[in-house]
């Protein structure tokens, strides 16, 4: 990766940025002072963020934080009463822009629709009233299994408005993945649709799960955008017969609002919990202050609501009273440059995208980009995985015309935003992060808890809690401590390998665990492996991700077949597609006699991954069966 300075902020940009206004609000001289003070006192930082962003409370908080039970259990905005909907919708009602368009939406076939803030407010009240009529109450979990429709956002905010907890699920999940998450969360309701389209293929979303929903004992109601009738089904059209007048529920600032599942390397999916104050405060700072998002911006991020970025997008735009563009389907169909044409058409000023999208776009015919007018773009935010030099420069030069700053960020579902970012007051290097996010107390340590040297890799950690940090894991306090606060005792260990150069620029070098990320979507090996094992056609299986230039990782399944198994590779590919969705289809299935294991029978995915990537597997002295390595190596990609 090139280490030269490639972008410099202008004096005008610095002077007019929200970051400068925030620094002045805090009575500080510059970003260096902000960074230093917030590192030692994150409570001071978040108190100022809340006040600067004019976040509203029904009852003011008496104290910004309480960490008396230990840093992992830090509580925020003590005794405060609020609601995400209060800060994303209600507080805008007296503003002129409330009659303006909030969401522009396009279906894959090009059909357009839109909704104003005023209309949106009435619709979420109708849906919220219906939920209450059907017996849903504060604290109940209601899932969203929907594509990028306006109705998805209406349901999302309606659930929050009545104090229920929203559980967004990736619209590409198969039935097993959906049912497992519904059961972990003990969901009482689910919003879904009859169908959507992806690359001209009709996806029958409700059909994919309806025959398995009886496995969710807690489920009481299905809210369906479609015409199918049934015992538990409430059809979307019936929402229109309900009152559009509904008071927003007053919730404790720390009440659960959103559950986003993320996958680790072992065990069941982990439910990260966002609070009513946590996400909106984090987005107000990360995107509003640091990435300069304003009420006049138009936002586009083609992310599924099932991922953290979906909640992030909904909150960024609405909390600022801005406009957003959503689109059914994918960024490169039916037009190869659909994503950029959406920016051109709607004059998008602020977009968020992944390196995976750019790797796919940069190999297309350069003529496709020649006549695009992307002059409305003033900010490009990126995240999800580390950059390599060539795609970063392509984005900067071809799309941004070497003028638009690329706001690289790194964080994740567990922190509801970023730990590292690019500060608009400092120069940018290719693919780097020129600063840690204030209020995150970020550092790089070795496993002994010691700071690493310049350019040395170590674990990305947080020394203190953050307002947006997950409130434990849903119904799993032990796993929360074991996974995040015990690797290096009393530090949050994020699972990313990081380094810092002599100029203070930070870099990521991939995950320090075995989580597989495909085009920005994360999945744990155990989820893939369990699908194969339960078929009875495999004795053992190991799922690993091999680096891929286009989508981040290729999924490779190494299978020890069951006796008398005559199934082909396609059989196992189809199993994964059915249960987990097409996004996680294996790129290759290999059959082997044995898998490398330690003496306590732990499968060594690190060794398998290295062999398949044709790399040195390192120390094999702990292996029970080192002879298995050569067979794996013979299948190297």
Regions found by a protein language model. Name each.
Residues 280-298, 308-349, 364-366, 441:
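Conserved AMP-binding/adenylation subdomain of ANL enzymes
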Residues 319-322, 349-353, 362-428, 441:
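Gly/Ser/Thr-rich phosphate-binding loop
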């Amino acid at each position: 990766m090139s280490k030269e300075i490639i972008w410099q902020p202008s004096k005008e940009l610095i002077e007019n940025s929200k970051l400068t206004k925030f620094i002045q609000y805090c009575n500080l001289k510059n970003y260096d002072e902000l960074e230093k003070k917030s590192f030692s006192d994150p409570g001071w930082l978040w108190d100022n963020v809340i006040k600067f962003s004019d976040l509203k409370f029904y009852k003011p908080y008496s104290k910004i934080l309480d960490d008396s039970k230990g840093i992992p259990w830090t509580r925020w905005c003590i005794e405060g009463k609020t609601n995400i909907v209060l800060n994303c919708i209600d507080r805008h009602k007296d503003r002129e822009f409330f009659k303006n368009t909030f969401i522009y939406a396009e279906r894959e076939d090009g059909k357009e629709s839109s909704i104003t803030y005023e209309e949106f407010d009435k619709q979420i009240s109708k849906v919220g009233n219906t939920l209450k009529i059907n017996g849903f109450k504060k604290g109940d979990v209601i899932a969203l299994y929907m594509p990028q429709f306006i109705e998805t956002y209406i349901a999302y905010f309606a659930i929050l408005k009545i104090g229920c907890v929203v559980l967004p699920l990736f619209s590409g999940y198969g039935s097993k993945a959906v049912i497992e998450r519904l059961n972990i969360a003990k969901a009482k309701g689910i919003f879904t649709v009859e169908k959507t389209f992806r690359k001209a293929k009709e996806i029958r979303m409700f059909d994919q799960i309806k025959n398995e929903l009886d496995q969710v004992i807690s489920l009481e109601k299905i809210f369906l955008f479609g015409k199918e009738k049934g015992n538990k089904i409430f059809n979307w059209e019936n929402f229109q017969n309900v009152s559009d007048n509904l008071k927003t529920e007053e919730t404790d600032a720390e009440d659960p609002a959103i559950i986003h599942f993320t996958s680790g390397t072992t065990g069941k999916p982990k439910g990260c919990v966002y609070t009513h104050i946590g996400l909106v405060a984090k987005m107000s700072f990360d995107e509003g202050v640091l990435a300069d998002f304003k009420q006049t911006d138009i936002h586009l991020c083609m992310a599924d609501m099932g991922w953290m970025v979906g909640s992030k997008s909904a909150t960024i735009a609405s909390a600022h009273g801005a406009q957003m563009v959503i689109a059914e389907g994918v960024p490169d169909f039916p037009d190869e440059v659909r994503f950029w044409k959406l920016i051109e058409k709607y004059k998008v000023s602020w977009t968020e995208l992944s390196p995976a999208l750019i790797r796919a776009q940069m190999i297309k015919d350069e003529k496709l980009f020649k006549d695009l007018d992307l002059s409305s773009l003033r900010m490009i935010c990126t995240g999800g995985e580390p950059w390599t030099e060539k795609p970063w420069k392509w984005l900067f030069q071809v799309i941004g015309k070497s003028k638009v700053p690329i706001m690289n960020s790194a964080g994740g579902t567990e922190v509801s935003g970023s730990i590292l970012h690019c500060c608009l007051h400092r120069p940018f290097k290719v693919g780097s992060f020129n600063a840690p996010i204030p209020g995150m107390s970020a550092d790089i340590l070795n496993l002994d808890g010691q700071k690493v040297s310049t350019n040395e890799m170590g674990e990305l950690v947080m020394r203190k809690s953050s307002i947006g940090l997950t409130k434990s894991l849903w119904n799993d306090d032990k796993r929360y401590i074991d996974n995040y606060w015990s690797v290096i005792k009393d530090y949050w260990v994020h699972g990313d390998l990081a380094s810092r150069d002599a100029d203070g620029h930070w870099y990521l070098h991939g995950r320090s665990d075995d989580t597989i990320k495909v085009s920005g979507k994360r999945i744990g090996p155990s989820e893939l492996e369990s699908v194969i094992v339960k078929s009875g056609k495999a004795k053992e299986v190991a799922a690993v991700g091999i680096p891929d230039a286009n989508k981040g990782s290729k999924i490779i399944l190494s299978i020890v077949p069951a006796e008398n198994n005559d199934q082909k590779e396609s059989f196992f590919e189809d199993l994964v597609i059915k249960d987990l969705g097409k996004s996680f289809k294996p790129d290759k299935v290999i059959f082997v006699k044995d898998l490398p294991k330690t003496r306590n029978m732990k499968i060594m995915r690190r060794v398998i991954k290295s062999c398949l990537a044709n790399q040195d597997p390192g120390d094999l002295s702990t292996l029970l069966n080192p002879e298995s390595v050569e067979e794996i190596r013979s299948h190297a990609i």
